[in-house]
């Protein structure tokens, strides 16, 4: 079942449930009124004959009827709110496991893609894209040793080769992965090809998961795709890239964005590629780049994180210019007046290095059906709630939508936001985001925005290092941030240089566990983390994908690391 279908079923179930409760309540009221009328009518007759009336028996009768109705209502509530959802989840797992065992299905989907083979092990289906710890969790978390899994990520095979910019998306059914293959050196503007793979999570005989590759695609057609972002969709993968023909600085200086491409690759090896023409891009954006991290398939839409430069005095520029987000670290006192800090924060969105463009984050939203890419739209984040535009990632966890934003500006700690926009009501004018306060996991960067800086400045630096929420930072009914909120990932624990990749589990203010490599000078770059659970054994695992510096084959090699999260 896709994420969109699951959400639709849940909304339908809630609507039926609410209607049922209203009908039961009205029935109780009607019965109570009828009983009261009958009792009153009977009592009037008795008074006329006997002139004596004792209301105790009447009240006892009414109370007994109401108690029995309340007991029935409580049973209905329990069955509808607890027992039935658990039964549905159990039935879903059984059905998906049965489909996997049969290993075939009718090619009834529009892309004729058989879905029977492309299905994760039943042990993991319901442990993917879920909160993995309770909101009240007060135990300890650690990370086990590295688990020896076969790598699903190919590396460079020549000293001058390079693999960069990994993007990984995992859903209940399968995973999708992509990276850039640079033929000579690691410069972003160099000619390159794009590698794409899809596969499933399986259980190994050693009692931990591994990632089995089912299909691969090597896009080697002379088109220089860059900064690609991937999404796992029903039956396959969707890949969004921009086509690089000049340097990054030249892109921002231009007034027409580079070509954008959306590629669909299905399990039956159907390949469809579209060139995007987006109505609200030309005239507003100098350049519009995929944000590297994976997107999501949400409520029938493909949603990719994007960022780029808004042209001065364009409609989009005017709607965002002057807006600013100013998070504060309670442990850090910044110099200057509040007004000076506000003015600096406002100015941090406009970068002279990039021709004075306003660097903006946004989401590219496309309906998936029939690959209707002419209906794609770009929706801006509200800059009063997010930092300067940067690379990022979208997640769906426990039905909630999240956005990781690379800390490319002056705030050096990790940046995660909960998206509060309801896409079921159509595309919004702006995306509303709620910052998840955290003050740890800094990234290295150039001065004055090296690791540990929390005061406004004008910078564009840092490195991509997304995070994974282990439980809900904003539980339902809570008025603030969950004090037990935990998250995990991998980051480069250094002030300036891109070195010392380190695995961690942390709260907003405290590292719960950190584990690095023997050599703290180990070169590294981008890191991406995805955590999931074996619902049979209840064991939690995190997959850390890290660009590791290489002295043998190319400047960087992308390596997948798997660790168990140890709960005590």
Swiss-Prot record:
Glycan-bearing residues: 44, 111, 268, 280, 382, 513
Membrane-related topology note: Single-pass type II membrane protein
Transmembrane segments: 19-39
Subcellular location: Virion membrane; Host cell membrane
Keyword Disulfide bond: yes
One GO MF term: exo-alpha-sialidase activity
Keyword Transmembrane set for record: yes
Name of the protein in its database record: Hemagglutinin-neuraminidase
Natural source organism: Simian virus 41
Gene that encodes the chain: HN
């Amino acid at each position: 079942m896709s994420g969109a279908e699951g959400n639709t079923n849940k909304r339908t179930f809630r609507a039926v449930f609410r209607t049922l409760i209203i009908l039961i309540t009205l029935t109780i009221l009607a019965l109570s009124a009828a009983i009261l009328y009958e009792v009153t009518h009977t009592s009037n007759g008795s008074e006329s004959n006997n002139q004596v009336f004792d209301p105790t028996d009447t009240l006892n009768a009414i109370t007994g009827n109401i108690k029995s109705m309340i007991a029935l209502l409580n049973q209905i509530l329990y069955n509808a709110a607890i027992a039935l959802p658990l039964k549905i989840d159990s039935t879903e797992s059984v059905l998906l496991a049965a489909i996997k065992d049969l290993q075939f299905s009718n090619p009834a989907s529009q892309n004729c893609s058989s879905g029977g083979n492309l299905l994760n092990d039943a042990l993991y289906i319901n442990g993917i894209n879920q909160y993995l710890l309770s909101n009240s969790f007060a135990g300890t978390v650690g990370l086990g040793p590295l688990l020896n899994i076969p790598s699903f990520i190919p590396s460079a095979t020549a000293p001058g080769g390079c693999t960069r910019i990994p993007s990984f998306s995992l859903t209940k059914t399968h995973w999708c992965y992509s990276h850039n293959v640079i033929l000579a050196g690691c410069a972003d503007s160099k000619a390159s090809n794009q590698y794409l793979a899809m596969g499933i999570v399986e259980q190994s005989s050693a009692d931990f998961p591994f990632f089995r590759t089912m299909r691969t695609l090597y896009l080697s057609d002379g088109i220089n795709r860059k900064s690609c972002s991937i999404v796992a969709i029903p039956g396959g993968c969707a890949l969004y890239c921009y086509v690089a023909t000049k340097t990054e600085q030249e892109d921002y200086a231009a007034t027409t964005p580079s070509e954008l491409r959306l590629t669909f690759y299905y399990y039956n090896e159907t390949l469809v590629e579209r060139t995007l023409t987006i109505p609200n891009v030309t005239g507003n954006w100098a350049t519009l780049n995929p944000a590297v991290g994976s997107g999501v398939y949400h409520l029938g839409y493909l949603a990719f994180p994007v960022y780029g430069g808004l042209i001065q005095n364009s409609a989009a520029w005017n709607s965002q210019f002057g807006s600013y987000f100013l998070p504060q670290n309670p442990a850090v006192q910044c110099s200057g007046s509040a007004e000076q800090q506000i003015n600096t924060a406002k100015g941090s969105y406009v970068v002279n290095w990039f021709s004075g463009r306003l660097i903006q984050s946004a989401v590219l939203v496309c309906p998936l059906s029939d690959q209707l890419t002419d209906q794609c739209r770009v929706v801006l984040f509200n800059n009063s709630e997010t930092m300067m535009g940067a690379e990022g990632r979208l997640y769906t966890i426990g039905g909630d939508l999240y956005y990781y934003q690379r800390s490319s500006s002056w705030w050096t700690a990790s940046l995660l936001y909960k998206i509060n926009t309801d896409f079921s009501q159509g595309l919004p004018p702006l995306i509303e985001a709620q910052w998840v306060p955290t003050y740890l996991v800094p990234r290295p960067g150039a001065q004055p925005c090296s690791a540990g800086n929390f005061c406004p400045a004008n910078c564009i630096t840092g490195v991509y290092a997304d995070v994974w929420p282990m439980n809900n930072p904003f539980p339902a009914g809570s008025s603030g941030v969950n004090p037990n909120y935990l998250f995990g990932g991998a980051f480069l624990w250094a002030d300036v240089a891109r070195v010392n990749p380190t695995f961690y589990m942390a709260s907003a203010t405290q590292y719960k566990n950190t584990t690095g490599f023997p050599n703290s000078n180990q070169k590294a770059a981008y890191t991406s983390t995805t955590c999931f659970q074996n619902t049979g054994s209840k064991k939690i695992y995190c997959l850390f994908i890290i660009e590791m510096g290489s002295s043998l084959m190319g400047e960087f090699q992308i390596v997948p690391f798997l660790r168990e999260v140890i709960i005590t």
